């Protein structure tokens, strides 16, 4: 049985410059709400499909810029609420407007207002010898600079082990943070960060830290119908590894060349997927994965970051940065190349970036392999929530989860 719920509030909130003169409730239009979070997205989003009985889309000229507010009361899990002052979801457009003689339906798309601010903000100046997590806090948050994104949303930036100096070059703030993610390292052996937004705020976190979290909940597959809200309603395993694209991106092997303008010297760094020390490394036939499939070139202009005539004294070599980036790219591609998609009764307490335990029954043919310690065929285990979608309305409430785990470095 699905969770008992009631949508108690679903409103369009007017803002300065919009045609709507007062709050407009969508409750009479039987709204269906979809709410999204993803480790790959720097913004939460939502859409509301409704029966436009009052013709608000056409009569009030809803074109975007309004704020979205909704509240859903769950019998057991409390209230799930999106507030225009805390979460700041702005309507970015209206789609699927379908007009018939007796009714009109429409869908409102909303996304964090910071995504729109990002399009007008630009990063200027130098960021010299600054830890990457500190740079993130300068680019977004309450303490952000005048050209960055000031927001009162929570910003959690996990400390990085390395620093990175760069010039803003008028990049957008969120684009800059995502550009810094593969350059960040939590230790000498752990590479790559993710920047994403959840219901609770912004997160800049190490991939390894996310994978090592303890599970917050357990969901099991059972054929017995009942009131168990931790059961899995549906599951599907997906493998999206594109060998051609992986070769084009240099995931298996690549070369990065450097030219130092100051010294006039040239060097290069070679990377292969074996550098990740994987217990189950991906292999290609005929030694295809051993030859570099991507060549990259960088110019090192250290003079752009020096003060006066003094030559910058950086403890981090360009080759070290290349190792961080190459290992981060490869690790991300491997982790997200396989996913387990499950559907569970709606659980608004879940967040992208949390770890859950999934328990699925083993086929009879796998029981023997399981007893022999071969865990590669067992889909049960701890998974990281990569993407999350709450679908609420139409007399049902489900949560769809896209789950990933590090199968390549997991111990058999």
Identify the meaning behind each predicted range.
Residues 1-120:
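Assembly/oligomerization scaffold segments
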Residues 6-8, 44, 66, 85-90, ...:
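Envelope-exposed proteins and targeting segments
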Residues 15, 51-53, 73-75, 90-97, ...:
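Solvent-exposed coil/turn segments that connect beta secondary-structure elements
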Residues 33-63, 224-412:
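An acidic/polar, Gly/Ser/Thr-rich interaction patch typically located in mid-to-C-terminal regions
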Residues 57, 120-129, 162-168:
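Second-shell loop/turn segments in exported
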Residues 58, 143, 181-188, 360:
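Sec/Tat-exported extracytoplasmic proteins
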Residues 97, 104-105, 109-116, 128-154:
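Glycine-rich, acidic and aromatic/proline-enriched surface loops and short helix-turn segments
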Residues 105-108, 112-114, 153-247:
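Short beta-strand-centered interaction patches in the first periplasmic/extracellular domains
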């Amino acid at each position: 049985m699905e969770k008992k719920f009631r949508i108690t509030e679903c409103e369009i909130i007017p803002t300065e410059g919009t045609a709507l003169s007062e709050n407009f409730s969508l409750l009479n239009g039987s709204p269906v709400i979809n709410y999204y979070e993803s480790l790959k997205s720097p913004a939460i989003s939502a859409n509301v499909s409704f029966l436009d009985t009052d013709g608000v889309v056409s009569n009030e000229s809803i074109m975007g810029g309004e704020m979205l507010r909704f509240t859903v009361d769950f019998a057991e899990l409390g209230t799930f609420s999106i507030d225009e002052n805390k979460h700041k979801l702005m309507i970015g457009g209206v789609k699927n407007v379908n007009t018939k003689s007796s009714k009109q339906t429409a869908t409102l798309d909303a996304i964090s207002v910071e995504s729109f601010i990002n399009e007008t903000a630009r990063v200027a100046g130098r960021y010299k010898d600054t830890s990457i997590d500190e740079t993130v806090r300068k680019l977004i948050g309450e303490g952000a600079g005048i050209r960055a994104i000031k927001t009162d949303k929570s910003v959690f930036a996990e400390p990085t082990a390395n620093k990175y100096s760069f010039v803003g070059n008028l990049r957008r703030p969120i684009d800059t943070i995502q550009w810094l993610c593969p350059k960040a390292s939590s230790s000498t052996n752990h590479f790559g960060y993710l920047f994403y937004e959840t219901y609770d705020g912004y997160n800049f976190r190490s991939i390894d830290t996310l994978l090592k979290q303890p599970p917050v909940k357990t969901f099991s597959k059972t054929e017995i119908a009942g009131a168990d809200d931790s059961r899995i309603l549906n599951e599907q395993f997906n493998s999206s590894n594109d060998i051609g694209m992986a070769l084009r991106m240099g995931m298996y092997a690549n070369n990065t060349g450097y030219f130092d303008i100051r010294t006039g010297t040239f060097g290069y760094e070679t990377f292969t997927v074996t550098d990740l020390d994987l217990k189950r490394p991906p292999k290609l036939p005929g030694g295809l994965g051993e030859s570099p499939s991507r060549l990259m070139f960088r110019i090192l202009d250290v003079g752009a970051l020096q003060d006066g005539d003094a030559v910058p004294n950086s403890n981090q070599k360009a080759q070290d940065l290349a190792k961080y980036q190459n290992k981060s790219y490869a690790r991300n591609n491997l982790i997200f190349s396989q996913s387990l998609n499950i559907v569970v009764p709606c659980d608004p307490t879940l967040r992208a970036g949390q770890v859950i335990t999934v328990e699925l029954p083993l086929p009879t043919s796998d029981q023997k392999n399981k007893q022999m310690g071969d865990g590669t065929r067992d889909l049960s285990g701890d998974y990281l929530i990569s993407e999350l979608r709450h679908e609420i309305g139409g007399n049902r409430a489900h949560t769809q989860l896209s789950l990933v785990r590090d199968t390549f470095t997991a111990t058999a």
